[in-house]
UniProtKB/Swiss-Prot annotation:
Subcellular compartments: Cellular thylakoid membrane
UniProt keyword list: Membrane, Photosynthesis, Repeat, Thylakoid, TPR repeat
UniProt main location, coarse: membrane
GO CC terms, sorted: plasma membrane-derived thylakoid membrane
The name this protein goes by in its record: Photosystem I assembly protein Ycf3
Domain of life: Bacteria
Membrane topology of the entry: Peripheral membrane protein
Gene Ontology biological process: photosynthesis
Start-end of each TPR repeat: 36-69, 73-106, 121-154
């Protein structure tokens, strides 16, 4: 039974019923698109409950069915979030990059890549590898700059870090 049918949360049930009604009423929505959306919705529900293996399984099914690049980018992004939560940072980076290939303006993916690169830079610094740390910090800065160009009112902490480290070669401030 799909997760959406097992949910005891009234708001989630209401959303599920409304989404199903909208999908039934929209002309031109194929059964494949409906299935992809159901898997994606179930993946999000499982992810929000910390059921990451189930969420990944649903996202993989959604990815196999979904044709739209933007929708695929969000599926890949959510898979990246799960791998990041599990501490699989390199795998998370792979999924964020795949999401960006499909949707270059996906600010949350740009930000998360920057966060992970910055974290890796901090680890390199702690290990005494200043050269690698500096390269990772510079790469993180480039992703934050891209995100800030798209959404100048977001990522205030990143903007402050860019300014304080002298990496703010950007005219959005």
């Amino acid at each position: 039974m799909p997760r959406s049918m097992k949910n005891d949360n009234f708001i989630d049930k209401t959303f599920t019923v409304m989404a199903d009604l909208i999908l039934k009423l929209l002309p031109g929505v194929s059964s494949e698109q409906k299935k992809a959306f159901a898997y994606y919705r179930d993946g999000m529900a499982a992810q929000s409950e910390g059921e990451y293996a189930e969420a990944l399984e649903n996202y993989r099914e959604a990815l196999a069915l979904e044709q739209g690049e933007e929708d695929r980018s969000y599926i890949l992004y959510n898979m990246g979030l799960i791998y990041q939560s599990n501490g699989e940072l390199d795998k998370a980076l792979e999924y964020y990059h795949q999401a960006l290939e499909l949707n270059p303006r996906l600010c949350s993916a740009l930000n998360n890549i920057a966060v992970l690169l910055h974290h890796k830079g901090e680890l390199s610094l702690q290990a005494g590898d200043e050269e690698t740390a500096e390269a990772l910090f510079n790469e993180a800065a480039q992703y934050w700059i891209r995100a800030i160009r798209i959404a100048p009112n977001n990522y205030i902490e990143a903007q402050n870090w860019l300014k304080t480290t002298g990496r703010a070669n950007l005219e959005v401030y």
